[in-house]
């Protein structure tokens, strides 16, 4: 072998070694990067274990570009500085901050305090409901979407015409006609934040607590816009005010006054809307019903023949059936019933099928169930619902 060939072979072997060491170096660099990450994480964990807790305070006033007056959670007020990495433009009156234990320097900005009751309202899931699953209320759905959906999705339409969009809507009518179902359909179709409020749960035995929950509820809604607040059974706190009464009645009246104040404080083109529901509209306070607070009142009546047929078809859609179903006969037999009664008819028909050891429903099951529900309706009292 010539000297040239020997040198060439050596060059090739060195080149292969170089590539091999180069790939090993890359692997080591990647391993080193992972080790550095683990080291930094361990350092942070050690610091967090060794670090001292911080005091929670509230900003009262900014004195100059570097100093703030802060009220600590324990009560006293201090003039303090601020860390360089804290955005001072967010340090306005009322903002919660954490303070260093020794120097009382503002360390970070904290989110606003949320009452657990309000937080539980916000995690209420409206469910997988669409307007297609609400039968016999086409006109009411149109009116509700005009008030709630249109201002949230197309506020420029109202600016163009020069009118102010409504703030809220009242749904009233007999029990079981679909008031809560409509509100859930609105929340599910819009995909916005949704606060489900049971009005009776707001009332607290301690003076001022109910009004505080109302304030926190509206404050949370404004911070998480767009938001829809649904207040069910509003007659629990929205009843007509009177001069006599116990201390509990006066507390409910204070709660109502706070609610009226919060509704008046809305920005018209704000992204917070209210839906209220009741089956006793005659007991509500006139101040709550006036335009500017509840601009539109939508009556949810008992379904007519067309509505009852739509509701029955919706409830029977996923039910195993055999033979032809005579919907017209069912509709005539269920005169004066509401949507909840019609759902009960389908459930009772299912029970009859189970008793007879069948896995499907037939026409006679539905007719028997409709007669049973009609007999039970005679036990219920009636209220004459006047248009508001």
Swiss-Prot record:
Keywords: ATP-binding, Nucleotide-binding, Proteasome. SUPFAM superfamilies: P-loop containing nucleoside triphosphate hydrolases. GO terms for cellular component: cytosol; nucleus; proteasome regulatory particle, base subcomplex. ATP binds at residues 173-180. It comes from the Eukaryota. GO terms for molecular function: ATP binding; ATP hydrolysis activity; proteasome-activating activity. Pfam families: AAA, AAA_lid_3, Prot_ATP_ID_OB_C. GO terms for biological process: ERAD pathway; positive regulation of RNA polymerase II transcription preinitiation complex assembly; proteasome-mediated ubiquitin-dependent protein catabolic process. The 26S proteasome is involved in the ATP-dependent degradation of ubiquitinated proteins. The regulatory (or ATPase) complex confers ATP dependency and substrate specificity to the 26S complex. Belongs to the AAA ATPase family. This is Probable 26S proteasome subunit rpt4. It comes from Schizosaccharomyces pombe (strain 972 / ATCC 24843). The lineage of its organism: Eukaryota, Fungi, Dikarya, Ascomycota, Taphrinomycotina.
